[in-house]
């Protein structure tokens, strides 16, 4: 009997070791700069195209107002208004090629390193809901998950973003080609039904109200919409955390209850931020995007509030666990995460 028990224990240990070895073998790390080498010129050009559109618009309007006749200035304003509403061909070959260039060179500026706990857990014939945190000033690390970066085995990916993005001239074209789309429930549901995996940033712009220096904030407790949609569609939830993203800009925001009331009223946090030489270009600080294992979600067309809260709790717990297990590995051993 004793020999049999020892034999069983040895088998259990062997199986346990095999599972651990398999997990390690499925763990994937990809550094953007090693995969897509760049230089200062290409990196800064890509970043300027990606996030400099708003500044370009304002600069052009300002220069036009100062140096051109008033009728010409009005023509330029009218042109921008047209760009706000003109339909976009999201499958444009030129646009897609531009954004492939932008994504790959911009990521290599920092660089961004993608960590996937189990690459074999993702299948090209399935759609997933990625919950990405934190938002920070800009969620720049999310670009490493796009199909332009071409690491995850998911050929159809979309990032859900605020509707305000799609009313901004030039920016709406570039970000649409880069895979961003409007964050409405109707759009979200239709994309999942069509086989698209969707990346959601649950904390959204409101998360920036609570940003703190030296720690990370995830505004999740009141965010159940993405969980409900995942349940209604029966799509796995995937926790994702980006380490270092909060360091690519220096920022300042006023404190106090009055500021919070104003920010909530305008649905925007008017923070002051700056990067390279005080510009809008982000600092060259490394980021690590860690993708956890999918949480299987049973399809439930009409989940109750309690059922949604239960699955939301599973997601939050998985995100916290992901954060704690990887923070030392990527150089942030003392960093803390607060869930609000």
From Swiss-Prot:
Involved in triacylglycerol (TAG) synthesis. Catalyzes the acylation of the sn-3 hydroxy group of sn-1,2-diricinolein using ricinoleoyl-CoA. Keywords: Acyltransferase, Endoplasmic reticulum, Lipid biosynthesis, Lipid droplet, Lipid metabolism, Membrane, Transferase, Transmembrane, Transmembrane helix. Disulfide bonds: none annotated. This is Diacylglycerol O-acyltransferase 2. InterPro entries: DAGAT. Its EC number is 2.3.1.20. The gene is DGAT2. One of its GO terms (molecular function) is diacylglycerol O-acyltransferase activity. The chain crosses the membrane at residues 18-38, 41-61.
């Amino acid at each position: 009997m004793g020999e049999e028990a020892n034999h069983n224990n040895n088998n259990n240990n062997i199986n346990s070791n095999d599972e651990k070895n398999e997990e390690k073998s499925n763990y994937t790390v990809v550094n953007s700069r090693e995969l897509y080498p760049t230089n200062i010129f290409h990196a800064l050009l890509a970043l300027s195209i990606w996030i400099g559109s708003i500044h370009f618009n304002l600069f052009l309007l300002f220069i036009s107002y100062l140096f051109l006749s008033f009728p010409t200035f009005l023509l330029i304003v009218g042109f921008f208004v047209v760009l706000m509403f003109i339909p976009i061909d999201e499958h444009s070959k030129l646009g897609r090629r531009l954004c492939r260039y932008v994504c790959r060179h911009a990521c290599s500026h920092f660089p961004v390193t993608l960590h996937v706990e189990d690459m074999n857990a993702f299948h090209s014939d399935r759609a997933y809901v990625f919950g990405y945190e934190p938002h920070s000033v800009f969620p720049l690390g999310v670009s490493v998950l796009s199909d332009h970066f071409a690491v995850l085995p998911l050929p159809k990916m979309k990032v859900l973003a605020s509707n305000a993005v799609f009313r901004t001239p030039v920016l709406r074209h570039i970000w649409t080609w880069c895979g961003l789309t409007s964050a409405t429930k109707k759009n979200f549901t239709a994309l999942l039904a069509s086989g698209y995996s969707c990346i959601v940033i649950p904390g959204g712009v409101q998360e920036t109200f609570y940003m703190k220096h030296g720690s990370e904030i995830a505004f999740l407790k009141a965010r159940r919409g993405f969980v409900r949609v995942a349940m209604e569609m029966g799509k796995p939830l995937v926790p994702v955390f980006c380490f270092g993203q909060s360091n690519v800009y220096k920022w300042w925001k006023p404190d106090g209850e009055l500021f919070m009331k104003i920010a909530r009223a305008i649905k925007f946090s008017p923070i002051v931020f700056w990067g390279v030489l005080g510009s809008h270009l982000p600092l060259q600080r490394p980021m690590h995007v860690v993708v956890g294992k999918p949480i299987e979600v049973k399809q439930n067309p009409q989940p109750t509030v309690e059922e949604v809260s239960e699955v939301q709790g599973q997601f939050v717990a998985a995100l916290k666990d992901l954060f704690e297990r990887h923070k030392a590995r990527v150089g942030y051993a003392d960093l803390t995460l607060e869930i609000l």
